[in-house]
Amino acid sequence: MSDALRRAAPRMIPFRIDGREAAFEEGTTVLEAARTLGIEIPTLCFNEAVSVYGACRLCVVEVSAGGRTRLTASCTYPIEEGLEVRTDTEEIRRARRLVIEMLLAKSPDAKPLQAVAAALGVETPGRFAFLPEDQNDCILCGLCARVCAEIVGAAAIDFAERGTRSAVVPFFHRHTEACIGCATCVAVCPTNYLKVEDLHAREVAHAWDSADDERRCILCSGWRTVARFHEDPAALLGIGTLEKEVP
């Protein structure tokens, strides 16, 4: 093999996952490798179309390397030579159940979370609860902000506040000129917190209660309000991976 071909060939990293020998390109995460091998790992904040954030921790797995074993988020952990991965042990199931219980404490009415909880054997309501004024269906996964910035290119929404007051909102908590009304944020929301509804002949984007006049959409060049969004924003953007991640 010539030096040029050798340099161009991707480096394959051998490792073990659930007792199986495997090898993937350098830089592949444990989650990506597992999905390619048909191993199911639940996720909420992960989407192939955008950068990894590692917010929900539902995809936790057990990794052993260098004589050390620990739990870690599979979406952010790159495979390495000699790595041993386990995706379904009692400790992992216990950790995932705790994650879902904590998410349900903040978002007790989120149907997708309830479905994941049922699959993991978690009873609802759980052991924990936020104060009613701090409860809503947003789990702070950041998918809406990431897709708005990285795919749409608008960067119209972002995180604000800290701690239990953290929220994803438009800048200055009001509709911004940066928003083009494509509703891609609605498409990727894993808990259906973001919705678009027609109120008194005005389209309002919940949960931000924002409305806007008609403007030209930079995606299709058509004139539309924030309410008249594209039925399939993922298809319009030319990507097919904006499905909601609900196991």
What is each stretch, according to the model?
Residues 1-123:
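Signature of N-terminal electron-transfer/Fe-S-associated modules in redox systems
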